Amino acid sequence: DCPSGWSSFKQYCYKPFKQLKTWEDAERFCLEQVKGAHLV
């Protein structure tokens, strides 16, 4: 199951964000959202 507000696709959870960030900042932001999350 995915966290509230996230979408499931092929056994993974996804959530788009529209904020502009560097790749490093975006990856850090993902990790802050859900443990184990990564930028794709």
Curated annotation (Swiss-Prot):
Name by which UniProt lists this protein: Snaclec tokaracetin subunit alpha
Job of this protein: Platelet antagonist that specifically and reversibly binds to a site on platelet glycoprotein Ibalpha (GP1BA) close to or identical with the site for vWF binding. It inhibits the binding of vWF to platelets and vWF-dependent shear-induced platelet aggregation.
Segments crossing the lipid bilayer: none
Main location: secreted
Cysteines paired by S-S bonds: 2-13
Subunit structure of this chain's protein: Heterodimer of subunits alpha and beta; disulfide-linked.
Domain of life: Eukaryota
Keywords recorded for this protein, A-Z: Disulfide bond, Hemostasis impairing toxin, Platelet aggregation inhibiting toxin, Secreted, Toxin
Expression sites (tissue/organ): Expressed by the venom gland.
Organism: Protobothrops tokarensis
Family: Belongs to the snaclec family.
Compartmental location: Secreted
Keyword NAD assigned: no
Any one GO molecular-function label of the UniProt entry: toxin activity
Domain C-type lectin: 1-40
Record-level GO cellular component terms: extracellular region
